[in-house]
């Protein structure tokens, strides 16, 4: 029996021959490689360490000990004296286990890792904050002036019976009312570090952040008025004594009179917001408190005429609180540098936008100009991206971080539904699915009890917001909805300023309780409508070609209306597109659930949308956890 002799093969050829893998193995390898997700840029990612004042430096992943530790070294590490114990031995012994805990990936939110742009706050810290603020149940616990405390119930929150401070108000108001240890105006030290106090207010949407910083600011303005009057009295006495001494020495010399110092165009408090819409909203709240507290306020934006801006800012009576956008204020400060010479408090509302690439140079310029007189710098936002978190740790390492337990979480009273537009009867038609959802909501009855005077003044008007990702689609979607008998309007950057104000007023202002005269007029109008006339109009028998959805108003908008706008009358939000990031999810659904009211969000999911992301957002909302 003879054995088959294999042909001789060169060893060099055998080593150079490619290794053939089964097709299934190579396909799995390719799919795993393509499934790797690119890391999101810092401005689109939420920071994981918002509440931490400092972060420990991470260890280098390079092995210092082992069989390959001596390779690629640029320095000769010659062992001289014997070491007591190596780092590896210390790690094995567990002596440093408490100092360097090993991080473990949570199985929750696997799909959201591509959108992890928010900074998570440890739940231990959230629980500690919750227990800390549990004892504060009334605004009487805060050391506010009596006139400021009275304005909360009469002007800021009128018509509410049981008024209690929200978590961010319980945290922020006492801290913002604390004085600096030295009690001096803010200046810059020799090494460049700011001496003024810095605060970061981070809380969920609709939690009352505006009132949380506005009440301490108004209180500070009234206290500074008393302080300035005392300083003026002392200054007048000093000048009078100096004048008497000069007259005694030189009785016949004429001295020019000094012009009186005016506070026109020199505000004490400046509130910066990114958009003109927020200028109008915050300015209304500031002006409402001024009715009882008595201070001078104003708001300026690009929607106003130059004459109106000049008369507001340079009022001869002076101005105490100014609400503006950064670019407009910076342009005014270039020609009128004294505008920023008396600022003691500076607020950056929606700080994640104001510290972004588009606003950062202008915002930094304003901060540097007000630094000589600044006492407190307040940053306020509902989402803290990683880019903002890193910037604050670099520029303001000593900033006081005031974070609420529900930061980066959507309110529990908001329910999220999903509509698959690929199924029947839509077959991928997103416009048709949106119109069908709106008709279903409009024809359904209200789940919440109606207003006590609804039977007198007429039916309740349902307000619905529809968010799109591109502003070009806002007009197209609104036009399609109008063709289906829906009262829809569009709002984007292309809309005029007058139209923006009129539209936002319908979706932000809640109707006050009707007066007896309004009730009588409504009843009279209803009786006239129910009466049978002697002569019918000519077009009475002509049927309408299009069905109309009654008692429903729809606003199709972009992210222009997703940040800071207080849409209290809105109970339904439709996400026409799946948001790009977790930040957009939080801000768009944050238009609901304000002041502990119920809300409903509906997402239209198509073939190319991330259904796993929407699923995990729903799970996080059900558990009441942050979307990180």
Swiss-Prot record:
Entry GO MF terms: ATP binding; ATP hydrolysis activity; RNA binding; RNA helicase activity
Primary subcellular site in the record, as a coarse category: mitochondrion
Sequence positions that bind ATP: 203-210
Motif position, Q motif: 137-170
Keywords associated with the record: ATP-binding, Helicase, Hydrolase, Mitochondrion, Nucleotide-binding, RNA-binding, Transit peptide
Transit peptide per record: 1-40
Coiled coil: none
SUPFAM superfamilies attached to this UniProt entry: P-loop containing nucleoside triphosphate hydrolases
Domain of life: Eukaryota
GO cellular component, one term: mitochondrion
Region feature Disordered, mapped onto this chain: 51-109, 228-260
E.C. numbers: 3.6.4.13
Helicase C-terminal domain boundaries: 456-628
Recorded catalytic activity of this chain's protein: ATP + H2O = ADP + phosphate + H(+)
Chain ranges passing through the membrane: none
Chain span(s) of sequence motif DEAD box: 349-352
Cellular localization per UniProt: Mitochondrion
Comment block on domains: The Q motif is unique to and characteristic of the DEAD box family of RNA helicases and controls ATP binding and hydrolysis.
Annotated function: ATP-binding RNA helicase involved in mitochondrial RNA metabolism. Required for maintenance of mitochondrial DNA.
Protein name: ATP-dependent RNA helicase mrh4, mitochondrial
Gene from which the chain derives: mrh4
